[in-house]
Amino acid sequence: MADVKKNCLASLSLAPISKAQQAQVGKDFYKFFFTNHPDLRKYFKGAENFTADDVQKSDRFEKLGSGLLLSVHILANTFDNEDVFRAFCRETIDRHVGRGLDPALWKAFWSVWVAFLESKGGVSGDQKAAWDKLGTVFNDECQHQLAKHGLPHL
């Protein structure tokens, strides 16, 4: 657990959460996401045809990106505290109930996240493995919470 946290945190230097950088890094994630995964834009009502330029100008994606970045930092920082980590996973699902997300996306997100980090700089093999482990545990808890809500789950 400690190695997973250590390696995830080390790679987060590529996605800083400082006051000066959080908003832009969050927008950068969604620009990367919309450019590389246009099929997933359908989950963002009103932004189904957004380009990276549209994301850059969007207050909505500034807020979404900042929130996503904060969530990823919280997950990495709490990975060695299983109760807090899993509670945050459940709360994440609770915030997304009713959005009709494909349950496979809760695991798939992490490969997109690693690819985003790689676009910002070098990510080591140990760091990739750490994100995969974190994503696996995250997904496991998310699938249990989806089931609790009676939603499709894997």
From Swiss-Prot:
Where, by residue number, does heme b bind?
H96
Quote the Pfam families the UniProt record gives: Globin
Task: Give the Gene3D superfamilies listed for this entry.
Answer: Globins
Query: One GO molecular function term?
Result: heme binding
Assigned GO CC terms = cytoplasm
Domain annotation Globin: ranges = 1-147
Recite the UniProt keywords alphabetically: Cytoplasm, Heme, Iron, Metal-binding, Oxygen transport, Transport
Places the protein is found: Cytoplasm
Quote additional remarks. Answer: The globins of the nematode parasite N.brasiliensis have oxygen affinities 100-fold higher than the rodent host's hemoglobins. Two isoforms are found, one located in the cuticle, and the other in the body of the nematode.
What family name appears in the similarity comment? Belongs to the globin family.
User: What protein am I looking at?
Assistant: Myoglobin
- Per the UniProt record, the source organism is Nippostrongylus brasiliensis (Rat hookworm)
